Amino acid sequence: VRRDQTSQDLNNLYGLARRARSKLEPSWYLNLAFYGNEQWLAWDGRQLFRPPVPRTKVTLVDNRIQPIIRKEIARMSKMRPVFTVTPNSADQEDTNAAVLGEELMRYLWKHLDMQRHRMNALLWSRICGAGFLKCFWDPSIGPKRTLVLKPDGDLLAAANGRAVNAGSPEHMLADSMAPGSLTTKSVAQGDVRVEVRSPFQMFIDPLCDNFAEAEWLIEESVKSEDYVYQRYGVTVAADTPANPGLVEARMGGAFTLLPGRTAYMGVRLREYWCKPNREHPQGCRQVWVTTTSTKGKVDSQILERDDAPFDPMPYVMFAGIPMPGRLMPMAVVDALRGPQTELNKVESQLAENRNRLGNPTLLMSRQAVQNAEQFAEQIGRVGGIYWYDDVGSPNAKPDVLPAPSLPEYVTDQIPLITQSMQEISGQHEVSSAQVPPGVTAASAINLLMEADDTMIAPDVADHEEELGKLGCKLLELVSHYYTTARTIQI
């Protein structure tokens, strides 16, 4: 039986899930670095680092990965999804409810800024193999009302069952009957909320082969002290540095703060979600915070527990390239990093050879050139003149040492690497509105475009299926929590 009753039990589950995915994290960090134009990095087992190279060495970056990812996201999200709600029966009431559901989804798509969340989740799935959307009810957002509380702390209700607003006739009447016994409280209306989660924040059941089979998961995030106090009513000391960026946070000494400066700190918040099981017939949700003292002692405190959450698994996952027998898919960047590294090396070698031709090595006689510093200064000027002594030796005159030319097979590597990256990504010339050499027939061009689109078809199908699941979750939340009249714009 899985133990999840105490904060220590939850921390143990967190450790198990973290160790299960530890071998994938280095690849995620490298993928992010390559996408962000940091492509001369390596992983030393703990963090990213730049291998030491001479200052004169050219480290050119010709980032072909970023446009590939952006094109793939554009191909998958160029059309706004259309949600279709099917009525349960042919009754007019069910038909009207289905029409209302479709109108409501159009409203929620704009109201919740779903396009931006969708793009961010897709970006994570293309770079790291998985991106998540979390759909839940947030009682702290929306317009606020001042309600009346009875002496026992419950809301004062009117005859129709609705809560009484402060200052209303019902409030005045109840207060006159029991002067001074009533209090008021500001309560938000609440609303549906959608947030993006990266694979770095998700610690999923290690026994599952796909996300739908996950029995539990833990989400980790860093929040401000005020956020924790507003949501859970407790004050927790911040001890976790704010994240400057996932790649930058793993760069070690290159991004260390200067002496005398302190980082902006936050609170490490963890959230446990569990599907129904023997211990939790209706599922379970727990929120706890983990702090570390100055002596290195780790303390944990459970802030909230819900033994009957409305949705015990409020996440959908956008997947990359499926890997048999593994929960986390791989990303196309994993396969592109090798060719991208070789492309950078070849182009850096060409740049170094170009620099040698523009600033060649000179041969000069020590007897003919009396002042070496003055000679070096003159040859660096345009049209500079330097007088040398003709000592009668054939080697007295300074001469240029010709730089060796690169073999043809080095320059031939660039088109080969480019073709390899096109095959890996499924983005050939036709995907970039370019006609391949020798192809003139319209039917042939259409076949090539169809071949590129076919390669991405499984990803598009998975994306549409997950969007459908998200739509169902949104409508279920609205049906359960929209208990008061609201105005929506269609």
Please give the residue ranges for each predicted region.
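Short coil/turn segments at secondary-structure boundaries
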Residues: F83-N88, R116-W124, C135-D138, N353-R366, ...
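A generic secondary-structure signal for well-formed alpha-helical elements
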Residues: L108, L112-R116, C135-I141, P206, ...
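Active-site-proximal structural scaffolding
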Residues: A98, M114, R126, L336-P339, ...
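Core structural elements
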Residues: I127-G131, Y386-W387, Q434-E450
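Charge-rich, acidic-biased intrinsically disordered regions
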Residues: N37, A42-L48, D152, M364-G380, ...
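Extended, charged amphipathic alpha-helical segments
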Residues: L257, A263-G266, R270-G438
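Extended, helix-rich architectural segments
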Residues: V1-R305, G358, Q374, P402, ...
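Extended amphipathic alpha-helical segments with heptad-repeat/coiled-coil character used for oligomerization
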Residues: P139, E408, S443-I490
